[in-house]
Amino acid sequence: MLNGWGRGDLRSGLCLWICGFLAFFKGSRGCVSEEQLFHTLFAHYNRFIRPVENVSDPVTVHFELAITQLANVDEVNQIMETNLWLRHVWKDYRLCWDPTEYDGIETLRVPADNIWKPDIVLYNNAVGDFQVEGKTKALLKYDGVITWTPPAIFKSSCPMDITFFPFDHQNCSLKFGSWTYDKAEIDLLIIGSKVDMNDFWENSEWEIVDASGYKHDIKYNCCEEIYTDITYSFYIRRLPMFYTINLIIPCLFISFLTVLVFYLPSDCGEKVTLCISVLLSLTVFLLVITETIPSTSLVIPLVGEYLLFTMIFVTLSIVVTVFVLNIHYRTPATHTMPKWVKTMFLQVFPSILMMRRPLDKTKEMDGVKDPKTHTKRPAKVKFTHRKEPKLLKECRHCHKSSEIAPGKRLSQQPAQWVTENSEHPPDVEDVIDSVQFIAENMKSHNETKEVEDDWKYMAMVVDRVFLWVFIIVCVFGTVGLFLQPLLGNTGAS
């Protein structure tokens, strides 16, 4: 049994060894065939000669562009950086073979430096090499069709239109063409009308809206020949979320703080300080913007227009605030309020703005209580009523005809009247003179206080007027500025 089992195992091992040897022999033969094919194709091959049988015939090169990443858009230097795959397809009649003669080999991967290839370059390259490096291999088919798809990183020049920054759209182009061969020697044909974006990685700041390719035949001033190029136009749109959150919204809040200046009471003494603080904040934002946008004097970006508008807005608020404070601290000794000013700012504008002075209610209440003593000085009426009993108490020895009738103002009973109609000792006369002096001082003080209150109320009315004016200008100015990109893009589309 053991002897029989050993013979069967030996037969199985021998069969496996024979199969492996045959497979190895076949693979070795295939490698030999590929090596022989490669040697046969490139034994007398000249990579500097165009692959055409007739010198007058052009080499037809099919070209296609595939984008994998929009790496960066540099607005300051006006450069667009892209990761691309450049697909070239052409036919070389010198590199054809019969697959049946080489064990069915239909394709070869050959180094790109060993074959003739079109010198396609990026015309508007800004940094780096203009031509694609030939370090990658090309796919060669048995019928002579060569497909070469080298990857490349290009930094192309792109004129930036920052009028609507950060809600802007840019149109950047990539112009490819042969640098030395004209149309009679190389004829470029575009594969498809769009850029291949199947392997594209989305960019966090820019969105590719459209990427179309066009073929152009151009005659340059330097030469008589016509040159063919293929230009791809990338229509990209900026995603404004970053700038909206970190730049525009803070600017909006700061600009609306300017409106609160006119709601701040003049007595607090911080109105001008608030205005200057807002102006300094906007200046800092303006310095930040100048580092992110290209230096150009052709246009002013939208954010720059808004900051300029807001800075003018804040500057005017400082001027108005100084004017309001000047009105607020005026006195009868320095200024006299004209009648038309009193009419406009103490009667007309308050009624339009639905403002009502608390002093008016006090006057109405005093007038209802005592119509006979209704005057513009309720405080002095109270003073007279408070002082009259004391005066009568001091003058009890005076003649009855000289008594001061209760309920009448002291200002209507001057000391001269008392002196002429009564007899009293000198000490009582001194008391009456003192009371008259105090009453006159109180009257002058009340008149001064009333004029000062009128100036303060006028300052309050001016503040309220400019509060509404600045609210309207701020809202409509902001909406008008930020509607420009929408209207501009609608018109362009």
Curated annotation (Swiss-Prot):
One GO molecular-function entry: transmembrane signaling receptor activity
Residue numbers carrying Phosphoserine: 401
Topology within the bilayer: Multi-pass membrane protein
Keywords associated with the record: Cell membrane, Disulfide bond, Glycoprotein, Ion channel, Ion transport, Ligand-gated ion channel, Membrane, Phosphoprotein, Receptor, Signal, Synapse, Transmembrane, Transmembrane helix, Transport
Source species, domain of life: Eukaryota
Notes on activation and inhibition: Activated by a myriad of ligands such as acetylcholine, cytisine and nicotine. CHRNA6 nAChR activity is inhibited by the antagonists alpha-conotoxin MII and PIA, a small disulfide-constrained peptides from cone snails.
InterPro entries, per database record: Neur_chan_lig-bd, Neur_chan_lig-bd_sf, Neur_channel, Neuro-gated_channel_TM_sf, Neuro_actylchol_rec, Neurotrans-gated_channel_TM, Neurotransmitter_ion_chnl_CS, Nicotinic_acetylcholine_rcpt
Pfam families hit by this protein: Neur_chan_LBD, Neur_chan_memb
SUPFAM superfamilies referenced in this protein's UniProt entry, alphabetically: Neurotransmitter-gated ion-channel transmembrane pore (SSF90112), Nicotinic receptor ligand binding domain-like (SSF63712)
Catalytic activity: Ca(2+)(in) = Ca(2+)(out); K(+)(in) = K(+)(out); Na(+)(in) = Na(+)(out)
GO-annotated biological processes: acetylcholine receptor signaling pathway; behavioral response to nicotine; membrane depolarization; monoatomic ion transmembrane transport; neuromuscular synaptic transmission; presynaptic modulation of chemical synaptic transmission; regulation of dopamine secretion; response to nicotine
Glycosylation sites: 54, 171
Signal peptide: 1-30
Disulfide bonds: 158-172, 222-223
CDD domains listed in its UniProt record: LGIC_TM_nAChR
Topological domain ranges for the Cytoplasmic compartment: 328-464
Extracellular compartment segments: 31-240
Family from the record: Belongs to the ligand-gated ion channel (TC 1.A.9) family. Acetylcholine receptor (TC 1.A.9.1) subfamily. Alpha-6/CHRNA6 sub-subfamily.
Description of how the protein assembles with itself and partners: Neuronal AChR is composed of two different types of subunits: alpha and non-alpha (beta). CHRNA6/alpha-6 subunit can be combined to CHRNB2/beta-2 and CHRNA4/alpha-4 to give rise to functional receptors. Interacts with LYPD6.
Free-text function comment from the UniProt entry: Component of neuronal acetylcholine receptors (nAChRs) that function as pentameric, ligand-gated cation channels with high calcium permeability among other activities. nAChRs are excitatory neurotrasnmitter receptors formed by a collection of nAChR subunits known to mediate synaptic transmission in the nervous system and the neuromuscular junction. Each nAchR subunit confers differential attributes to channel properties, including activation, deactivation and desensitization kinetics, pH sensitivity, cation permeability, and binding to allosteric modulators.
Family annotation (PANTHER family): NEUROTRANSMITTER GATED ION CHANNEL
Protein name from the UniProt record: Neuronal acetylcholine receptor subunit alpha-6
Species this chain originates from: Rattus norvegicus
